[in-house]
Amino acid sequence: MQLATELSDWGQRVVQPDIFELIDEAEKHPPTVSTHTTFGRPRTSLHTSHGWQELQRLGIAAGVVAIPYEEANRSARLRQFMKIHLWTGSAAMVMCPSSMTDGAATLLRRHLSGTKLTEQQRSVFTEAYRRLTSRDPSEAWTSGQWMTERSGGSDVRNTETVATFVGHDAGGKDAHGMPLGPWNISGFKWFSSATDSQMAVLLAQTGKGLSAFYAPMRRTSTDGKTVEMNGVSIQRLKPKLGTRALPTAELVLDGMRAYLIGQEGEGVKEISAILNITRVHTAIGALGYWGRGLAISRAYARVRKVQGSLLEHNPAYVRALADNSLQYAAHMHFGFFTVLLLGIVEEPTSFQDSTKGVSASPRLVSSVNQAQALLRLLTPIAKCKCSRAAASGLQECMESLGGVGFLEDEQEFNVARLWRDNFANVIWEGTTEVMAADIVRVLRGRDGEKIQSAFFVWVSERLDACRNASNNLKGLDGIVQAIDAQSTELKEKWLCLSAEELRYHGRQLMEALFRVVAGVLLLDNASMGGQDKSGQTKEVKIELANRWLNPRNASGPLDCKLHAEPAALDREIALGSVHSSSGLPKHKSML
């Protein structure tokens, strides 16, 4: 009940009028940069709006970064991302720096738990970690993540920025009095978001290859009297389709002092720790935008009259809304299953303690090792599929409002902004092709056989559990058989291909994996039976799984006999059980 109350209160808070006013201000007053003084002396002065700053403070205080670092609990990530899901539609992009802050905190925590840091490194990283995970806006930091360069793009191995070791006695302090690092970095970063952050994790070449570095954004001047940029200057801010409140810049690095993270030449390995976090953020953030868009569509349907009747009573309108809601439900199950896996992997002891004496059947995951394998495989799929589906889903939401959906007046109705901002999720942290290639690397890499085995064991375990549940619930047997057939096809048709063939068919492979996992999760949800706290009846749960496996074909033959029952279920799926007809016919499997 405590979590439910927390989420309910937070959900109410993020849609209050003062929040929409802050969003509006952040949108209407995008960041600006001043690069020179009146007399032509170079300087970098970044200005962000009051709305942006206040929204960032609100998110920090709510713990959108801090929650998983405050408690060693496998469910902390679920709690964090449920709040983020509610927050994203109101955050005016402050979750972008927050996601990178989360990734940086994860990376520093990993190194602080080891024994390879020098005393100075440990001191500096400890202070940075404290600030990254703080809920106090006056103390908290955000972090940038600088990888992209003109020559390399997503291929970070073509990074041209260079780091030179200048010695531990080089001296200097950052803006907070901590010693500057022994590396000097120079180069150019073509695309860097969260330019107003207090630190950054970045990639640069050393004599031993691509390496990762920690660097503060500001340092104390040599005379100790002023604070200046730590060898960073903003060349320009990026003009963008969306994310307008977010300061995204081209950066020139000239003598940026930094600390090496990990070993030289292992930059990709180190930065992957951040990417694994930010990709989950991307998936859940996309779902947050989509969920907000659907909420607006539902609210509109309840008040908009066409030809004297509310849209919520228009069967064709409700059918389209139900189809969108089905896609949303499937992607929500997939996205939050990925979050569950992340929490288990990060807090294995908590998971093991919670499962002592509990049979495997009711658990979505049977072991930490299984969670690790599934997380590595499913994270890029979640990132890609959730962001792309949200883009399509939000387009449907815009269309459902008619001309209102294209307008950007009041922020509480502004689906256009949600669509614009979400579309960045499709591209950054890896496009579709980059994610598809990553999946092939997972399946054909060193641990590929182990990960494949873990995946199919998981599918088998869940289907067995659902078979047992189907003895008490009509309509599940056919769904179990259909998913089993999909899983077999995945194994026999796709995973027998060579790496080269898989890369060519990367999108189709990703879709096949996604549909199996989403089907299993929707089936698992249906097997729980009657109405739960979500308000979904068992008929709706079964229907969601059924429709996922058998999507309605707009060009297929019309069966008038099925019209009444699907229309009633459409209403429940789109608008909730409170709106459903009390005369809902007994459910019949549509397989």
Language model features by range: what are they?
Residues 178-229:
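A short core secondary-structure module
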Residues 330-383, 494-504, 527, 531-534:
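C-terminal helix-coil-helix/basic helical segment that borders enzyme active sites and/or dimer interfaces
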Residues 223-227, 235, 247-278, 295-313, ...:
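A glycine-rich, basic-preceded beta-loop-alpha segment at the flavin cofactor/substrate interface
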Residues 128, 141-145, 159, 184-188, ...:
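Extended, hydrophobic alpha-helical segments in both membrane/secreted and soluble proteins
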